Amino acid sequence: MSLARLRVHHLRNLESVDIEPSSRVNLIYGLNGSGKTSLLEAINVLALGRSFRSHKHKPLISHQQLAFTIFGRVLADDAAEIPIGIQRNQQGEVMLKANGANVGSIADLAIFLPVQVINSDTFLLLEGSPKVRRQFMDWLVFHVEHQFYPQWKSLQRCLKHRNSLLRRDRIDPFELSTWDQELVQLTEQIHCFREQCMALFVPVFEQLLQEFVVLEGLELHYQRGWDKHKDYAQVLQDSFERDKRLGVTHAGSHRAELRITLNGQDAAEILSRGQQKLLVCALKIAQGLVFSQVTGRKCIYLVDDLPAELDEQHRQRLVDWLYRMDTQVFITGVERQALLAGWLDKPEITPKMFHVEHGRVSCPA
């Protein structure tokens, strides 16, 4: 799986870009503010319909333009070429296409281009809210279990209706029972999907971590979001009065968590900044490995400002793992030589260089 061509129009300071990346290593250099991160951002938007820098769509559209357009030609692992594209205007209206036909949702587009991002925000995986870690888990579940996303969407709809019902002055017991039954079924299915994926993920991560950083006593704990000793139906019944008082469903798979601890304590509170970065890199690489093992496909890695995020020794470890995964990578940095340094001991790899200056992308000889 690789991105064979990328065309970007009117995204931030990228007015018009048309490149043909290498199927392996792509190194993007340029001064801060030149647009190199925006190039990675364009790939992420093409893959997921959203930016890794902002949840708002308007800042993505170039000044005085009506919309941005991103087109990609994906080379699948079976050598088939799949054209995909996204356009979003100032009003937020979006047009999605794959293989020349309109696509109904971002989820339908996302299956064509699985990407992993490693940047400064990635380290929120440890420090951020449980939602960040749920999203991390669910990336893998989404890509390996195709029934997950429809079930997840149904769960969100069910929670919305149940919470609305809880806020009424008078609650119809039959209506509550109907929503509770559906919620129980969906919640248990979502939990099953996550539990199965984490059972695959954890041993791969634990083995991989030793090559990044030795952290004796580090553990991952998948927590399903309600008392593991109780059936979810019983939990809903027991917590009804509190849920009604506060107008929200407290327990369930929407409150699941991936706890990362060191000797029983929150790892984010104990580890140094450098150790945290290495831990997160191991999490991201392990996720790509499990994805490949289960699906037989490979994901694309977008690594922003690598020289600034890791010291030379640990930067080399990440580069070595990206090399071993035999997948497509896009890595940005300010200095050309600093980016190239990690690949000098790999003569069979010839990185493709891209220089970004004032939103213009060139491919120097």
From Swiss-Prot:
InterPro entries: DNA-binding_RecF, DNA-binding_RecF_CS, P-loop_NTPase, RecF/RecN/SMC_N, RecF_2. Keywords: ATP-binding, Cytoplasm, DNA damage, DNA repair, DNA replication, DNA-binding, Nucleotide-binding, SOS response. Its main location: cytoplasm. It is found in: Cytoplasm. One of its GO terms (biological process) is double-strand break repair. ATP binds at G30, L31, N32, G33, S34, G35, K36, T37. Gene3D superfamilies: P-loop containing nucleotide triphosphate hydrolases, RecF/RecN/SMC, N-terminal domain. GO terms for molecular function: ATP binding; single-stranded DNA binding. GO terms for cellular component: cytoplasm. NCBIfam families: recf. HAMAP family: RecF (MF_00365). PANTHER family: DNA REPLICATION AND REPAIR PROTEIN RECF. Belongs to the RecF family. The RecF protein is involved in DNA metabolism; it is required for DNA replication and normal SOS inducibility. RecF binds preferentially to single-stranded, linear DNA. It also seems to bind ATP. This is DNA replication and repair protein RecF. It comes from Cellvibrio japonicus (strain Ueda107) (Pseudomonas fluorescens subsp. cellulosa).
